């Protein structure tokens, strides 16, 4: 069996996870993940097909971490000052960032010398969602000498996850769609508002 066929089979298993044979294994894994640390470095990706598709290579300079994020909307600290009840909102607030982007940022906080390349979903339970984040050491010789990934070593890509330059960041900023219907998303939501003043 070729690697292409193997990756395709893995991908098909993950598409219908609850019906597949690996579902029981995945459930037992998540019990351990739930009680462990929120950001954990892994020896190898859980979903090798997805990791390879997003640019991961099994060589020095690449690492994979699993990041855990609480599901649902966000809460903010309860407001103690007086105001109209409708202005008191402190729970059931919709996040402006996706859970995937939050997971990437937390992984970048844990490893400040690495850059986030991409991330992918690996599971969820009643309380958390789990993502695996691919991180790259941009100062490693394997990285800056590799023509496919050396672009991440350039200075303009420093801290890319915090500036919404990863795939999850682009989606949150509304830059996945074409020009029609998303005219207020470019050059950015904030800059567009300033231009229209």
UniProtKB/Swiss-Prot annotation:
One GO term of the biological process aspect: cytoplasmic translation
Gene (name only): rpl15e
Protein name as annotated: Large ribosomal subunit protein eL15
Taxonomic path: Archaea, Methanobacteriati, Thermoplasmatota, Thermoplasmata, Thermoplasmatales
GO MF annotation terms: RNA binding; structural constituent of ribosome
Region (Disordered) location: 175-197
Assigned keywords, A-Z: Ribonucleoprotein, Ribosomal protein
Family from the record: Belongs to the eukaryotic ribosomal protein eL15 family.
GO cellular component, one term: cytosolic large ribosomal subunit
Gene3D superfamilies: Ribosomal protein l15e (3.40.1120.10)
Disulfide bond residue pairs: none
One Pfam family it belongs to: Ribosomal_L15e
Organism of derivation: Thermoplasma volcanium (strain ATCC 51530 / DSM 4299 / JCM 9571 / NBRC 15438 / GSS1)
